[in-house]
Amino acid sequence: MGAMSPLLQPNLSPQLVDCGLVCAGACGGALARYGAHTAAKSRNMGPVAICTLNVLGSLAIGGLAGAGAGPRASLAFGTGFCGAFTTFSTFALDSVTLITAEKYALAAAYVLANNCLSIGGAAAGFTVARKVKPLLGRLAGAGGAG
């Protein structure tokens, strides 16, 4: 039998594993974003949809950080999934589009809402995860004792 393919060897480099985790997470995040974008487009939601995606992604990454996720979970779900799911570039383009259409008040409200709600989402996710993690640990400990 021939030599085993480098991809099938059990001793993959940590960098290759990390890259795979980011790619897998990004694939999931991009597909989730595409699904949300398709649903929002059919409902004519416009920039509200992008703001919603950014807030949800911020909530998720805040929860990940608050739960004390390990480095590999952070790569897969934080860098990968949340990075692909949220969309700063579309937010920026939507803002420019509103400004060039001379909808200054709407542009200002959009920028303010996106930033404040996203930061609030990250803070809420972080706080809730910090509060829930010890409770889950106690429940798991109680379940294992019985």
Short names for language-model regions:
Residues 1-146:
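Membrane-interface helix-loop junctions in multi-pass transporters/channels
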